[in-house]
Amino acid sequence: MSPKTETKASVGFQAGVKDYRLTYYTPEYQTKDTDILAAFRVTPQPGVPPEEAGAAVAAESSTGTWTTVWTDGLTSLDRYKGRCYDLEPVPGEDNLFIAYVAYPLDLFEVGSVTNMFTSIVGNVFGYKALRALRLEDLRIPPAYIKTFQGPPHGIQVERDKLNKYGRPLLGCTIKPKLGLSAKNYGRAVYECLRGGLDFTKDDENVNSQPFMRWRDRFVFCAEALNKAQAETGEIKGHYLNATAGTCEEMIKRAVFARELGVPIVMHDYLTGGFTANTSLAHYCRDNGLLLHIHRAMHAVIDRQKNHGMHFRVLAKALRLSGGDHIHGGTVVGKLEGEREITLGFVDLLRDDFVEKDRSRGIYFTQDWVSMPGVLPVASGGIHVWHMPALTEIFGDDAVLQFGGGTLGHPWGNAPGAVANRVALEACVQARNEGRDLVREGNEVIREASKWSAELAAACEVWKEIKFEFAPVDTV
């Protein structure tokens, strides 16, 4: 070894591997208002102490690597490292812990969900010393929130654009989701909108296939909603799915939608990616388009209880990235969603300030500092008998979306839309009169069906349909 090399090695650097907890487990740390805080559900491998597991998460998602490196001495690790500052056992579990990690804000690029997730939910999820790892919640500090545009418009601006107040909005996903020609697709859109719905929707996998190219679909749907608007005197919308194989193609489709004069476009934000989604959200604000968001692929990420990422984190990320609507479960339909947990992330989407509430899965108080809210969309296996529960659960600021519950009506699409609109109006009126929709909901629907043959027919078709399975997602 040369004298020069010996001199370098003697200046405080000692090669080798040391426990993460010696550097990254800091229970004495006082979190800062500017820190991003994360709550991880950690399952260590047998023999790995929880302190080491929590410290490993902090290290591998910030500045650490598996061995000491001499370039650590060229920066201030105390300034930039993530810190596991608290650990708590999960009640009723032998080897499960909630690890709380604080990240200094300097680790993240401004206005980039992509960069934030690349660190916090990156390679650390494949770390061998952990049997499983799940990100349960994030606290996004106001200092970071202010670097994002957020939703293109938000709830109040959307209501003003549509001139619709005092009730949930009604939607319908056109079925079959694949296989219709553009003209027949447009016909279904027209029938639903003239029957009383506010919106119709492209399904998440309707993009530009051989049986229906995107441009043809856009033209026929624009014609349908213009005709329905003229007949009903109400503003109508159809979620034209702009999701595409490239960002350039996606923006081209959004530009064409704007030229057609439609009020809203749509994006699959997880399969399309956060960079694409944020770009589209910026375009929508600049050009007066509302943005509907579908969460296709979310269950791949969020349905396993001990590994992955909870949907409340994906919901927060969407509010930062930008969207005016997002699908968020129904509680009562065919898709996963426990009531209190669902309402927890619904509040995180809509409200300005949400208090910590572990009973609803909210690990941190979240201040959105006046960032516009996002309308939750309840969709999946719902029909007219669910209307009282949906009205009671979600209140006015939601979109209730009935696909099969509209198009499956025995008399056709327009009568299906009429049935849903009558049921909704009846439930809103009953609620406003002080009636208890939980106890009296079925009676409210029966009373309304006496005055609406369309609703009576829908009630008969779906009177026995239930989806009674225990939710996987529990606190």
Curated annotation (Swiss-Prot):
Cofactor(s) the protein requires to work: Mg(2+)
Domain of life assignment: Eukaryota
Assigned EC number: 4.1.1.39
Catalytic activity, reaction form: 2 (2R)-3-phosphoglycerate + 2 H(+) = D-ribulose 1,5-bisphosphate + CO2 + H2O; D-ribulose 1,5-bisphosphate + O2 = 2-phosphoglycolate + (2R)-3-phosphoglycerate + 2 H(+)
Pfam families, A to Z: RuBisCO_large (PF00016), RuBisCO_large_N (PF02788)
Post-translational modification: The disulfide bond which can form in the large chain dimeric partners within the hexadecamer appears to be associated with oxidative stress and protein turnover.
GO molecular function, one term: monooxygenase activity
Residue ranges of the propeptide: 1-2
PROSITE patterns listed in its UniProt record: RUBISCO_LARGE
Residues annotated as binding substrate: 123, 173, 177, 295, 327, 379
N6-carboxylysine PTM positions: 201
Uppermost EC category: lyase
Cofactor note: Binds 1 Mg(2+) ion per subunit.
Residues binding Mg(2+): 201, 203-204
Major subcellular site: plastid
N-acetylproline sites (modified residues): 3
HAMAP family from the UniProt entry: RuBisCO_L_type1
Subunit description: Heterohexadecamer of 8 large chains and 8 small chains; disulfide-linked. The disulfide link is formed within the large subunit homodimers.
Family per similarity comment: Belongs to the RuBisCO large chain family. Type I subfamily.
Function comment: RuBisCO catalyzes two reactions: the carboxylation of D-ribulose 1,5-bisphosphate, the primary event in carbon dioxide fixation, as well as the oxidative fragmentation of the pentose substrate in the photorespiration process. Both reactions occur simultaneously and in competition at the same active site.
Protein name: Ribulose bisphosphate carboxylase large chain
Taxonomic placement: Eukaryota, Viridiplantae, Streptophyta, Embryophyta, Tracheophyta
Gene symbol of the encoding locus: rbcL
